[in-house]
Amino acid sequence: MENNIDNLCVNTIRLLGVEMINKANSGHPGIVLGSAAIIHTLYTRHLNINVKEVDWWNRDRFILSAGHGSAMLYAINHLAGYDITIEDLKSFRQYQSRTPGHPEYKHTEGVEMTTGPLGQGIASACGMALAEKYLANHFNKDNLNIVDHYTYVLCGDGDLQEGIAQEAISFAGHTNLSKLIVLYDSNDIQLDGEVNLANSENTKLKFESMSWDYQLVKDGNDIEAIDKAICNAKKSNKPSLIEIKTIIGYGCPDSGTNLIHGKPLGEANTKALRENLGYDYAPFEVDSEVYDFYKENVEKRGIEANTVWSNKLREYHTKFSDKYNEFVNFMTYSFKFDYSKLKEYPNGESTRKILGAYLDEYSNQLPNLIGGSADLTPSTFVKGADGNFEADFLNGRNIRFGVREHAMGAIVNGINLHGGLKAFGAGFFVFSDYMKPAIRQAAIMKLPSIFIFSHDTVCVGEDGPTHEPIEHFAMLRSIPNLNVMRPADYKEVRACLDIAINSISTPSVITTSRQALPTLEHTDSTAARFGAYVVYEASKNIDGILISSGSELSIAIDTAKALEKENIFVRVVSMPSPYLFDNQEEEYKESVLPSSITKRLAIEMGASLPWYKYAKYVKGIDTFGISAPISYMHKHFGFDVESLTEFYKNLK
C-alpha cells in the first residue's frame, strides 16, 4: 500500500474492528486484520451503493459470506456513511445493539443478508446474480440498462469447504452468472490450524473446471493488484473468483496462525499491532481525512451513480411506458390474480398434482414468479414457466437446480433478497434435511421464500425408509417464523399456495401427497387460512376431537363416522397449518378446540412430538418406514379406519 490515505483507511478499519472486539471481549480479529485492504478496495473503487438511499434498486450487492468478519463490515459501513455510529461500534455484540455478532438482514444498514453459517452467503449470492441476469434480460432495451449491477462476495477458506458452496459454484458456472464476483480471502488458516490439514484442492483448476474465471492476487495488501483483478472480473463473461493471498491477523504477534482467528487481541497485542502498523490514534478515533475520503469515493460516487440511473429510468419511462409500468409492478409485486382460473377437482387427486397445476396457473398470471425443482420435476410437478433458464436462454423461469437441494434453498433466498422476483424451490419432503439450514436462514431473515415438498409420508411406499419422512414435520414446525402447511384436498391447496405467494415476511413450506386423495365435503379455502377449522361436527354431545391434516384428514373423518355408529360422537378438525392457527385470536382457537374437551386425538403419519401441544393423545409414527406397496402402509402403521376406531375407543 503505497498511497498514504489508502493505508490510513485500511488501518482505521483494522483498528476499529480490533477495538470493537476487544471491548466486547468477543469476536474474530483475524479476518479484520487480513482482509481490510480487500474490502476497502471494493468499497472505494467499485461498489455502487447509495448510503443515503440504502434500498436504491440498482445498487451493487455485497455479501460478507464469512459473517464472522462482521466487525470489519460494521467498521467500513460506518466510514462509508451508513447509519452506524461510533457508539454502535462500541456496542458490538451487546444486548439490543445495532451491531450483532454476525450480520443480520434488516437489522443494520448496509447488510444485504444474514450470514454466519458458512457457505450460505455464496449460494444466496448466486440467487441474487441470477435475479439480476433474468431481470436485465427482461427489461433492458436500446442500451437503457435499468437493471445493471454486480453481486460481490467476500468469503474465506471455510466457506469454500462447505458442501453448499460446491453446489452453488457448480450451478453458477453452469448458468454463467457472469456478474457474480467472489473475493476469496485465502490465508491458509482455519480454526483448527493450517488449511492443508483438511484441504488439498487446486483452487484454480477446480473453479476453471466449473466454468469460472480465476485470478490470483499474491499480496492481500496490494490495493492496485486487487483493483486490477476486480476490473478484469467485471469484464469477464463468466462468474469470477479472485483468490487473494492474505495473512490472517496481519500486523499482530500471532499473525499467520490459528491463534488469531477467534479471540480478542487484548491490550498487549493491540499495542504491538499499533506499533507495527504505525497507527497512533486512540481507540475509536477516526481521522477526518478518512471520513472525507470515504465521503468522496463511496458516498458521493454512489449518489452520482444513482442519479445517472434515475435519469436513465426517466428516459426509459418516456420511451417504453408499458415496459416501465411492468418494471414498477415487478419491483412492488403489484400483480392481480384471477382465482376463477383455478380448476376444481371434485373427484379428488394427489395434492402434488393439484399444486403443480395451480402453480402453473399462478406462473401464467404472475410474470415475476420463478423457480423449479431439484431434479424432481416429474415427481413434484413443480416447475417454472416459459422454458428453462439457461446460460443461452434467459427468458426461462424454470430453474433446473439439479440435485443440489441445499444450494437450491439458498438460491431461492437470494432471488427473494434481490427483489423483483418471487422464487420457489421443490423436492422430496425427506430431503428437506438437506435444505434445513437455508430454510432456517429464510425464517431468520423474514423472507417469503416458498419451499414445496412432495411425497410427505410413508405412503411413498416401495422406496422404503430412506425416502419416507418421519421426523421432518417436527423439525420444520419447530423453526420459528416458518409456516408449514399440509393441505388435504384442492380447496386447501388453493388456500395454502395463495398464502405462500402473498406472504411478505414469513417463508412457507407446503407438503403434498404422492397418492390421490378424495375431495372432502366440508373443507374450505377460506377457513383453511385460519390454520385449523372444524370439518366434521358431532351430531350429539361431543365425546372428543380428532385433529388431522393432509392425507390423513379423510381417514379421520371416516373414523368419526365409524365411531358415530357406535354412539361415540367426535368432532374432526383439519389443521393444515399449526403456525397459522397459533397466530389466531384466543376466541377463535377456543371455538375450534374448546378447552373443556380434553379428549383429543391427533392423527398424522409422522413423528408424534409436535401434536402434544394440541392433543393429549397422538397417533403418529415414531419408527422409520418400510419398503412395501402403499396398500400395506395404512394397516401396517395403524392408520386404517378400523385401527383408529379401536385406538380411540381405548383412550381414557
Predicted segments, located by residue:
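Residue-level marker for buried hydrophobic side chains located in beta-strands
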Residues: 153-154, 182, 372, 486, ...
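Short acidic, Gly/Ser-rich segments with clustered Asp/Glu that frequently serve as metal-coordination loops
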Residues: 158-164
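Thiamine diphosphate
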Residues: 1-150, 297-508, 516, 641, ...
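Terminal amphipathic helices with adjacent charged low-complexity linkers/tails
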Residues: 58, 240-333
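Conserved beta-strand elements of the Class I
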Residues: 152, 370, 545-547
